[in-house]
């Protein structure tokens, strides 16, 4: 199918798009030596650090390094995918605006009959009545159920990389800005075809039983700075359709590269933290910067 998502959606959410999703915490799995990838763009009066994140982490995961801490301390401004990452009200308002529509088919009819029992189990675990899901657009239902998967893995939004990086900037009164808004991020899903949305929902339901091992492998790849391991999630065309890849990755990476190129024209030191998937693979932000004559040097 052109809308194939198999085995890739969960990892895309954690390292690619969803910094506003969340759940509760458990102990972290064993990790390799911490060395998450970081790059630097620099000229005579401007320095931009690029750091790839995981949007949700388990409790106790070690990932900080001296090089990263020095870059954060020396930066005047923090740039995230979404600045108000912990603003649940903004997320709820955006979801209500974009994710609810009248006249939709029942949610049970939007997955194959063989998968309905598994989906209903996740709906029950979410604590949201199925009648509410019937009113949600398919992409919104998928995101809501993805939260069940995160909860099962013990992931905590307060421990996500963006929240932890943001604290020293906010407490010291430094600027924190976003490349996008929550509504803009949800809007990427809202523009997907219904076929792509249903593939997304089915993928969330099917992946729920498989994600523990996937998450452990992806987390180790991120922690150790294994770009090839991260990129496999995003470059495998059997895991992401061209429609999804364009909407959620390629177009956004190009827009961010444009933003970075403009930012390099102004003096100062900036720390940019975005999902690790955007900084790995064939359509990475760095490769798009290279087309503009800007080379990001890996420094960790």
Give short role names for the model-derived ranges.
Residues 239-300:
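A cross-kingdom marker for long, charged
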Residues 32, 42, 264-266:
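Extracellular/periplasmic catalytic domains that process cell-envelope and extracellular macromolecules
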Residues 24-33:
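Boundary at the C-terminal end of the N-terminal hydrophobic targeting segment
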Residues 13, 34-36:
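Short beta-strand-initiation
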Residues 2-13:
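Bacterial N-terminal signal peptides that target proteins for export
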Residues 11-21:
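Bacterial N-terminal signal peptides
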Residues 33, 63, 255:
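Short, conserved clusters of charged catalytic residues that mark active-site
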Residues 37-248:
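Structured, acidic catalytic/metal-binding patches in enzyme active sites
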